[in-house]
A protein has these predicted regions:
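Proline-aspartate-enriched helix->loop->beta-strand connector
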Residues: 159-169, 173, 189
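Short, flexible loop segments at boundaries between secondary-structure elements
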Residues: 144-150, 190-226
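Conserved acidic residues
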Residues: 69, 113, 140, 165, ...
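N-terminal nucleotide/polyanion-binding subdomain common to many enzyme families
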Residues: 2-91
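A transmembrane-helix-recognition feature enriched in membrane-embedded lipid enzymes
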Residues: 77-82, 209-257
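A short, gly/pro- and small-residue-rich
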Residues: 59, 63-67, 177-195
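Short glycine-rich anion-binding loops that position phosphate/pyrophosphate groups of nucleotides
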Residues: 48-52, 171-176, 198
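Conserved beta-alpha
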Residues: 79-158, 162
Length: 257
């Protein structure tokens, strides 16, 4: 897949392009996007199985994912799809891991960060906790995600006043991705990336699965045990696996002729 003069190494999974990159490459590409953006709000995504399956029934979301200039592989199901394509992904980069990688890079480069999303004190607690890990990172603002439509302009105005290099948006998918694209021309940020439930983990609201569970790709099951309300969303995983197993050409989407 070619973006301008840059050829991206991607795997196409049911029409969704996902970058085949290492963690270091994810940092380097993000840095390059920031440097070239000039406050044009370059969109970054972290597609997982739920994203891919939702995109099969939501054309707007499918088209939005096509706009991402970087898409990190964020679930074990995506990794398995790469193996079926006989082009294995180099590594799985979950959303929270990408969040940490970017903060690490931002601390080193002096980039500024804004956290949008989460409930109540969650973004503040997430900010305080990650600042203990990255003491020199410049998180210059935050705002919880349960704002009313009439206060949305105030939120955007605050972000634009600060002009952060990096905007993380944690409103849940597909809302966060749609929100970024809806306001892409208004937002004076260099890059914007959806972050789902990352703030909850960073704030300590939800405990991450033990490392051994993460390594075997069963973190989704751990999350289901901790959050039974996610069961409807989690049904996307077995549906994806069946689709993966029974579909001969897994690169195509029903939206593409």
């Amino acid at each position: 897949m070619e973006e301008g003069n840059v050829v991206r190494d991607t795997n196409r999974i049911f029409g969704v392009d996902i970058d085949n990159i290492t963690e270091k490459e994810a940092q380097d590409i993000t840095k390059e996007l920031i440097e070239k953006s000039n406050k044009s709000c370059t969109f970054i995504a972290s597609p997982n199985v739920e994203f891919v399956m939702h995109a099969q029934k939501d054309k707007e979301f499918f088209d939005i994912l096509k706009k991402a200039k970087l898409s990190t592989p964020d679930s074990i199901g995506i990794i398995w799809a790469g193996k079926k394509l006989k082009k294995p992904f180099k590594i799985r980069i979950p959303g929270q891991r990408y969040f940490r990688l970017v903060l690490e890079m931002a601390e080193k480069e002096g980039y500024t960060v804004y956290l949008l999303g989460g409930k109540g004190d969650t973004p503040r607690l997430a900010k305080e906790n990650v600042e203990k890990i990255y003491p020199k990172v410049k998180i210059i603002g935050y705002h919880e995600g349960y704002f009313e439509q009439d206060s949305e302009e105030e939120v955007i105005e605050e972000i634009n006043k600060l002009k952060p290099n990096i905007l993380f948006v944690a409103l849940g998918a597909p809302k966060q991705e749609k929100w970024i694209i809806q306001h892409q021309k208004e937002l004076k940020v260099d890059v914007a990336a959806g972050q789902g439930g990352t703030y909850d983990y960073e704030a300590g609201n939800i405990k991450r699965a033990p490392i051994w569970i993460q390594k075997i790709g069963m973190e989704w099951f751990w999350r289901l045990l901790k959050q039974p309300s996610r069961i409807v969303r989690m049904m996307a995983i077995p549906k994806f696996m069946l689709k993966l197993f029974f579909t001969k050409d897994i690169t195509k989407s029903k939206w593409e002729k």
